[in-house]
Each structure stands twice: as structure tokens, then as C-alpha cells.
């Protein structure tokens, strides 16, 4: 479009930064013998509906998959006119090693990237342990440094926390909290 081809990986870098926030969450479970077990909660880039499909594809057989686990997905990209600056404005930076040459960059165009983080668990307690490790960092936003075309701070804003209770089968069937 407009004669110039470019790809700065800006959306990809924002998704990677978001996933990095949640990729080392662990919970502790205590068994009947009073032994404490640390469990790393796996994270994948996938819609929550694909949890089971991804597990089956990886193993080749239909099995119960390890819970809790998390996934995140990009759900929308919306132009944000409230943050718009003059897009005809250029920013100049010196070429590394040569102060007589300048690189010019156009002003960034503001978009809001909506991402949904889903937590699947079979025990309410496990879900609460994961959520309580996330919520204190968002007041309601957490700022992350992104090394995009130029390094900048990206606010990650917590908009909503909700629970979904899924049952499969009758009263004795499998139950999942998402």
C-alpha cells in the first residue's frame, strides 16, 4: 500500500511481551501426606476452546490433559483516537556511528490491542491461586518496555476478570473452570 513495503513485527512483539508476563506462574498443591508440590502452569498462544484439541494433537491420543493451564489470544485491534498525535510529525535519530546522518521515523499510530488470557483448571482453588498471582500487578495497568522500531513503554490494562464454569456429562461428569 502506498508503494512502501514494511513489517516491523510490532503486533508480534506486543503479543510476545504479553505472554512473557505470564509464562512462569507456579502454584503449590499439598497432597494427603502433607507433601508440597510446585506445579508450573503451562501457557500457550491459543483460544481457550483449543486447549483440548492442542493436547490431543500433541499426543495423538485422546487423554485427560494436565490442569491448570493458561492460554492467551489476540481478540481485536482498535484505533484509539484519544491518543492520536500528529501523524505527519517525524522523529529524527542519528545513525549509529555517524552524527551527520539522520534516520527519520513517522509518529506512531495509536491502536488498542485486546488480548484475552484464559485459565483452565479443574479445581476452584487452583484457579484462585493463579489469579491471585496476577491481580496485584495490575492497578489497573502494568507497563512493559517493548523494543519495537524504537524502545517504548506499553501499558497492559486489566479490563475484566470473569469466571466460566463448564460441565461435561451429568452430575459426575468432568468439570472445568475457565
Question: Model-flagged regions — what are they?
Answer:
Residues 79, 124-127:
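Short beta-strands and strand-coil junctions in structured, solvent-facing domains, enriched
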Residues 48-52, 93-99, 159-164:
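A short linear-motif detector with a strong N-terminal bias
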Residues 1-90:
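Small/polar-rich, solvent-exposed N-terminal microdomains that initiate assembly or binding
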Residues 1-8, 116-125:
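Short, charged/polar micro-motifs that form catalytic or ligand-binding hotspots
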Residues 107-110, 129-131, 135-178:
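Acidic-leaning, charged glycine-interspersed low-complexity segments
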Residues 56-63, 97-105, 130:
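Residue-level detector of functional hotspots within protein domains
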Residues 86-121:
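Short acidic, glycine/tyrosine-flanked loop/strand segments centered on an H-E-D-like triad
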Residues 68-76, 107-123, 132-134, 175-178:
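Oligomerization/assembly interface segments of phage tail-like spikes and tubes
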Amino acid at each position: 500500500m502506498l508503494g512502501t513495503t514494511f513489517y516491523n513485527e510490532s503486533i508480534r512483539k506486543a503479543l510476545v511481551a504479553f505472554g512473557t508476563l505470564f509464562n512462569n506462574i507456579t502454584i503449590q498443591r499439598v497432597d494427603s501426606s502433607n507433601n508440597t508440590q510446585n506445579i508450573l502452569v503451562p501457557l500457550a498462544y491459543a483460544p481457550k476452546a483449543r486447549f483440548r484439541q492442542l493436547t490431543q494433537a500433541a499426543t495423538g491420543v485422546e487423554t485427560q490433559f494436565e490442569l491448570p493451564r493458561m492460554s492467551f489470544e489476540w481478540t481485536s485491534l482498535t484505533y484509539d483516537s484519544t491518543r492520536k498525535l500528529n501523524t505527519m510529525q517525524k522523529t529524527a535519530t542519528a545513525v549509529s556511528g555517524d552524527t551527520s546522518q539522520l534516520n527519520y521515523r513517522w509518529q506512531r499510530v495509536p491502536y488498542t490491542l485486546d488480548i484475552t488470557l484464559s485459565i483452565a483448571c479443574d479445581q476452584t482453588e487452583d484457579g484462585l491461586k493463579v489469579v491471585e498471582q496476577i491481580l496485584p500487578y495490575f492497578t489497573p495497568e502494568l507497563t512493559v518496555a517493548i523494543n519495537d522500531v524504537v524502545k517504548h513503554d506499553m501499558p497492559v490494562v486489566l479490563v475484566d476478570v470473569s469466571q466460566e464454569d463448564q460441565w461435561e456429562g451429568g452430575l459426575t461428569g468432568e468439570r472445568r473452570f475457565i
